[in-house]
């Protein structure tokens, strides 16, 4: 059999709800699908170091009124963040928790699909099941105005 790697890219809000989802090939750079996924967003977008890109940040600011906030790499100049942004950046574990629930509870990480249709059916049914969960992981005591999304 053949194995075709894929990546699931997701943007979630502070309530753990899926805002945008995209599937790409496994060898796709993480920054590539962000432009498609974030066009209708506004506010602040929190991501890990894999999303650091001056060009992406400028594009998001210009086309979607979104600010990308990431942790810095080792040899980057420190940047001053607002205290709320710093606190929210420390809650990136919310994304890992959501992906953990998608993989373990919704069983989207299944490697023996017999067809592309079976793969897509399994993925979509897992995403739909997650959307119907009554209790999703959230950031507690969220008092910030506006929408917060996390990559």
Predicted segments with their positions:
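Anion-binding and metal-coordination hotspots
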Residues: 45-46, 60-67, 115, 120, ...
């Amino acid at each position: 059999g053949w194995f075709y790697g894929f990546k699931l890219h997701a943007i979630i809000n502070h309530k753990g709800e899926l805002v945008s989802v995209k599937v790409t090939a496994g060898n796709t750079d993480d920054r590539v699908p962000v432009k498609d996924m974030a066009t209708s967003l506004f506010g602040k977008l929190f991501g890990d170091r894999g999303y650091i890109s001056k060009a992406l940040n400028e594009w998001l600011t210009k086309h979607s009124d979104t600010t990308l906030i990431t942790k810095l790499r080792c040899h980057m100049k420190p940047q001053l963040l607002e205290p709320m942004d710093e606190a929210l950046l420390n809650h990136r574990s919310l994304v890992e928790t959501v992906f953990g629930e998608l993989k373990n509870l919704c069983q989207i990480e299944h490697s023996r699909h017999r067809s592309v249709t079976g793969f897509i059916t399994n993925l979509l049914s897992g995403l739909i099941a997650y959307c119907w969960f009554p209790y999703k992981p959230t950031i507690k005591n969220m008092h910030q105005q506006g929408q917060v999304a996390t990559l």
